[in-house]
Amino acid sequence: MSDMASWQPSAPVANLLKRASILSTIRRFFSDRGVLEVDTPSMSQATVTDVHLVPFQTHFVGPGVAQGMMLYLMTSPEYHMKRLLAAGSGPIYQLCRSFRNEESGRYHNPEFTMLEWYRPHYDMYRLMNEVDDLLQQVLECESAETLSYQQAFIRHLDVDPLSADKTQLREVAAKLDLSNVADNEEDRDTLLQLLFAFGVEPHIGKERPVFVYHFPASQASLAQISTEDHRVAERFEVYYRGVELANGFHELTDAAEQRQRFEQDNRKRAAAGLPQQPIDEHLLAALEHGMPDSSGVALGVDRLIMLALSAERLSEVIAFSVDRA
């Protein structure tokens, strides 16, 4: 990149104008439905424990904290928004910057725009319908297909992900030429994620968005376990044209169970040689106080806009990608 060109935005100005219009459409969508827009902090003293996420860290030095207070840039506004739900906010949404210290590429930028919203008294299916409404409005696409995680595996890999053992999963991996990775992998969820990424994702959501729901209970994250089938979690993801767009939950409200999951994450981190993360005690206190039964979803806005504009890379729809920041 020449010095003369490096100052310029990564996205054409015409795309930035279209981006602004889409953001206005999103805000109007929620305003028309009586959902409150909120703003929450971009930094916190606690962070996510998820073994797959790497947060950015910084230090605050001020009165009373001369030694420095460790702060983390938020990977998602989820924890703060749940505290608002517990305080009685009602339905809320947020358009905000989120930060993840991960790869930069076609579908990734370490700083990105997140749309996250929560609906008290919605189950997972009702929220999926609302996500579908938003996608149709922004992308002018057909109504989404819905497919359970189990159905997706059986259809595309001819294996039941809820009952197959690790040997069976490795056999499927071999058919996908993934033996070099799968043969030495002992974690069942990692094997499932590998098969999903290489054996399922490339085949779904080509013509219209697809909702994949009821992920294995072991991948529940912050979602409730299904009361109808304890093998699965009330969790869904949305895919369209090769892009993962959104991740949603029927939210876990049990503080004790959530603490156990955070602690289990930290044990996994320790086993993998990763630093353990501080647990968000404020979130747990909010859950203990009582958060209404809710469903929530996080959607990648830059990816949504990329699809709406038929762009090839995120850098074509954000003003300055990390290499020009």
UniProtKB/Swiss-Prot annotation:
Disulfide bonds, paired cysteine numbers: none
Binding of substrate, residues: 76-78, 118, 251
SUPFAM superfamilies for the chain: Class II aaRS and biotin synthetases (SSF55681)
Biological process terms in GO annotation: lysyl-tRNA aminoacylation
PROSITE patterns linked: AA_TRNA_LIGASE_II
Role summary: With EpmB is involved in the beta-lysylation step of the post-translational modification of translation elongation factor P (EF-P). Catalyzes the ATP-dependent activation of (R)-beta-lysine produced by EpmB, forming a lysyl-adenylate, from which the beta-lysyl moiety is then transferred to the epsilon-amino group of a conserved specific lysine residue in EF-P.
Subunit structure: Homodimer.
Name of the protein in its database record: Elongation factor P--(R)-beta-lysine ligase
Native organism taxonomy: Bacteria, Pseudomonadati, Pseudomonadota, Gammaproteobacteria, Enterobacterales
